[in-house]
Amino acid sequence: MTMPITVPFVGFTQAELQSFRNASVPDLVGPRLKLLFVGINPGLWTAATQTHFAHPGNRFYPALRLAGIIDRDLDRGRPMTEADRAYFVERGIGITNLVNRATARASELAAAELLAGRTRLEEFVALHQPIVVAIAGVTAYRVAFAVPKATEGEQPVELMGARVWVVPNPSGLNAHQTITSLAQAYAEPAKVAGVIT
């Protein structure tokens, strides 16, 4: 039996990454959506791989694994496989962004883009009807939803019938969080959504 040859994935050059500036990334969503994670916007690595939260330094997938939301490791930095995408859909987990425009840093977004992202998110939630929406990033939430004093955790409002949580951003740039603290924050909305018990 011949074994396939695997070529190590070494990443992207800065020029390659910059070529993905302003690109979009398709939403990961399917029927029977329970828990919708909402990123701020795609990073350049995410746009290059067409995989949400894909930067090698992003702690999203390790935190989901530690929380028991997923039961497999995903190879950060590589494109998500079709089997991985199907696994998320089967679990009732979806991923979208407030703004679907790739930048090197979320701080490159204008406030108007975040406000428009709220409208897009409302339409998305109305269409897909998740039980819980978990928005990853309190600063972006404050701007997009015009709630300047919002804190992380469950919010006192619903979004098109879905309960809303603000959870910490898993970016490696968010030095205040660890994989353990992210896992704890992500487990709470996952329990309410019925993804974990």
Predicted regions and their residues:
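Short, hydrophobic/glycine-enriched beta-strand segments
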Residues: 30-40
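Structural motif
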Residues: 33-35, 92-93, 162-163
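Short, solvent-exposed loop/turn segments at secondary-structure junctions
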Residues: 41-45, 100-103, 139-141, 170-173
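Short, surface-exposed acidic-centric catalytic microdomains
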Residues: 46-112
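Residues that scaffold the ATP/ADP-binding catalytic core of kinase and kinase-like folds
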Residues: 47, 63, 143-144, 176
